[in-house]
């Protein structure tokens, strides 16, 4: 070795190894969080894709699709010449022509293996039809948009979105100030509710002990036994759903990170957007 050349000392090598170890540990610690953020970005993209398909379906057919159920093979259950058999259920992927990760019941799954929930309004303006305005052929056009009394709209979805719920008040928003969309208290907003709602119950969906606002989104009235479905597992699993017929028409959407680990993703479309798209397509006057 040339006496003029110097190498790293053991202390210098040890310091470098320590720094590398710290950086690797930091990276490894961040990976689960980065993976979770990616999953939520994937959820947002997929839900936006589903909503676009639902609005496109309405532009073509003049109505909203009914939800699918576990044994309907990804096809809407009812709708068209008759109203939906169930107004709460799952994304009708085959009716909408969507692709994605499905389980054995042909239900579209979020990144955590839970089917996206899809709820469509069963509201019926008193036009003599006696069927849901948003899901039966010709009903939306027959009912029309304009009314002379508040909320100045005859086509009126009943879903209310808020950022704080109250199970003790029959599944409604805690107060007018927390309403994000809708007019359950009659104190604001031109519409009484959204025509449809799409939900992912998030990473903690399999926690049967869900409470508070997450329980509002899952369903205060248990319409089925809660058997967490296994992705690509046996068909016929039971799922928990809100019961619209029991008045469960409120959904909660707020940021994650609260003490109760709220992580649901809730999306809907304003009637302004839905109706304008349908007018453009000639489906509404």
Q: Where are each of the predicted segments found?
A:
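N-terminal pilin/flagellin-like segments and related low-complexity appendage regions
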Residues: 33-285
């Amino acid at each position: 070795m040339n006496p003029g050349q110097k190498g790293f000392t053991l202390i210098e090598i040890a310091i470098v190894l320590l720094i590398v170890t710290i950086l690797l540990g930091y990276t490894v610690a961040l990976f689960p969080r980065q993976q979770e953020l990616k999953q939520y970005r994937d959820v947002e993209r997929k839900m936006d894709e589903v909503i676009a398909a639902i609005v496109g379906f309405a532009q073509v057919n003049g109505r909203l699709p009914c939800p699918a159920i576990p044994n309907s093979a990804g096809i809407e259950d009812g709708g068209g010449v008759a109203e939906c058999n169930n107004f709460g259920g799952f994304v009708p992927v085959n009716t909408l022509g969507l692709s994605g990760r499905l389980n054995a019941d042909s239900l579209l799954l979020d990144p955590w293996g839970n089917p996206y929930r899809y709820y469509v309004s069963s509201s019926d303006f008193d036009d003599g039809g006696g069927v849901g305005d948003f899901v039966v052929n010709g009903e939306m056009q027959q009912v029309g948009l304009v009314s002379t009394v508040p909320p100045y709209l005859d086509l009126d979805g009943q879903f209310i979105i808020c950022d704080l719920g109250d199970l003790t008040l029959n599944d409604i928003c805690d107060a007018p100030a927390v309403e994000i969309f809708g007019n359950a208290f009659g104190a604001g907003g031109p519409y009484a509710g959204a025509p449809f709602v799409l939900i992912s119950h998030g990473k903690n969906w399999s926690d049967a002990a869900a409470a508070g606002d997450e329980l509002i989104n899952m369903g205060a009235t248990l319409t089925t036994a809660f058997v967490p479905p296994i992705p690509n597992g046996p068909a016929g699993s039971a799922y928990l759903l809100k019961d619209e017929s029991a008045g469960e028409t409120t959904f909660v959407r707020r940021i994650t990170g609260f003490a109760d680990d709220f992580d649901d993703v809730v999306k809907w479309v304003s009637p302004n957007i839905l109706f304008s798209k349908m007018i453009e397509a000639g489906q509404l006057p």
